[in-house]
Amino acid sequence: MSKHSHFKDKKKFYKKIEQFKEFQERISVHFQNEKLLYQAFTHSSYVNEHRKKPYEDNERLEFLGDAVLELTISQFLFAKYPAMSEGDLTKLRAAIVCEPSLVSLAHELSFGDLVLLGKGEEMTGGRKRPALLADVFEAFIGALYLDQGLDPVQQFLKVYVFPKINDGAFSHVMDFKSQLQEFVQRDGKGSLEYKILNEKGPAHNREFEALVSLKGEALGIGNGRSKKEAEQHAAQEALAKMQKHHTKQ
């Protein structure tokens, strides 16, 4: 299938080609085989409405992209959190690759504007349907992997996904206190102590400041709307410091 056959007439063709060119410039990714890029954004409804054309939908690419995404995210988490248990790694990965997270990424990159949809799917709001956008994101990852291999996929995620992990966008699924405890116990360093340093604000909107220490040495300070949340944030800060020190050794 030539890329020219993917669009009905010259006007639509050139408009769509221009969109895909702008998209590649914007994300600093340039496909060698642009057919894979177009396929990643081709919904089955579009193929069904053009049965006489040799179009391919994105479902197989989605299948591949799902596996590639899990692998690359797993590698990143494995390296970043050396003290995290298998169970917590699994929970965190699940939060990153779940539908709402992928939809958010697809929106951020304006994937919906590029999707090729059948008229029926378009009329029923398919372009904004969460499941469709999540599938397109996975298909794009699959297409990029087939086109260029694993390294460019990791580079793409390094720009658009890994910073969100570093910024704690998925920390709601993580138990930092348990991780810190495991890290400390593993090295036989003693017992952790948590202390509330400060609390302020009205009863309905309290803010707490917590300190976590080890043998009298302050490891981390955190704030939160509850004592538990403040302690979790203190543990998160302490864990980040200790892991950074650990990797330097």
Curated annotation (Swiss-Prot):
What are the recorded GO MF terms, alphabetically? Answer: double-stranded RNA binding; metal ion binding; ribonuclease III activity; rRNA binding
- What's in the keyword line of the UniProt record? Cytoplasm, Endonuclease, Hydrolase, Magnesium, Metal-binding, mRNA processing, Nuclease, RNA-binding, rRNA processing, rRNA-binding, tRNA processing
Q: What's the cofactor?
A: Mg(2+)
- Residues bound to Mg(2+) are E62, D135, E138
The catalytic activity of this protein is classed by the Enzyme Commission as 3.1.26.3
GO CC terms of this entry: cytoplasm
Q: Which Gene3D superfamilies does this one have?
A: 3.30.160.20, Ribonuclease III domain
Pfam families membership: dsrm, Ribonucleas_3_3
Which InterPro entries does its entry note?
dsRBD_dom (IPR014720), RNase_III (IPR011907), RNase_III_dom (IPR000999), RNase_III_sf (IPR036389)
GO BP terms: mRNA processing; regulation of gene expression; rRNA processing; tRNA processing
Domain RNase III per the UniProt entry, residue ranges: 20-149
Q: Does the keyword Acetylation apply?
A: no
Q: Where in the cell is it found?
A: Cytoplasm
> Could you tell me which residues belong to the region Disordered?
223-249
Q: Where is the DRBM domain?
A: 175-244
- rRNA processing is among the record's keywords: yes
PROSITE patterns the record matches: DS_RBD, RNASE_3_1, RNASE_3_2
CDD domains in the record: DSRM_RNAse_III_family (cd10845), RIBOc (cd00593)
> Which reaction(s) are listed as its catalytic activity?
Endonucleolytic cleavage to 5'-phosphomonoester
Xref: NCBIfam families: RNaseIII (TIGR02191)
How does this protein assemble?
Answer: Homodimer.
HAMAP family, alphabetized: RNase_III
Hey, which family's this protein in?
Belongs to the ribonuclease III family.
Job of this protein: Digests double-stranded RNA. Involved in the processing of primary rRNA transcript to yield the immediate precursors to the large and small rRNAs (23S and 16S). Processes some mRNAs, and tRNAs when they are encoded in the rRNA operon. Processes pre-crRNA and tracrRNA of type II CRISPR loci if present in the organism.
What name is this protein filed under?
Answer: Ribonuclease 3
Natural source organism: Bacillus velezensis (strain DSM 23117 / BGSC 10A6 / LMG 26770 / FZB42) (Bacillus amyloliquefaciens subsp. plantarum)
Lineage, please? Bacteria, Bacillati, Bacillota, Bacilli, Bacillales
What gene name is given for the protein in this entry?
A: rnc
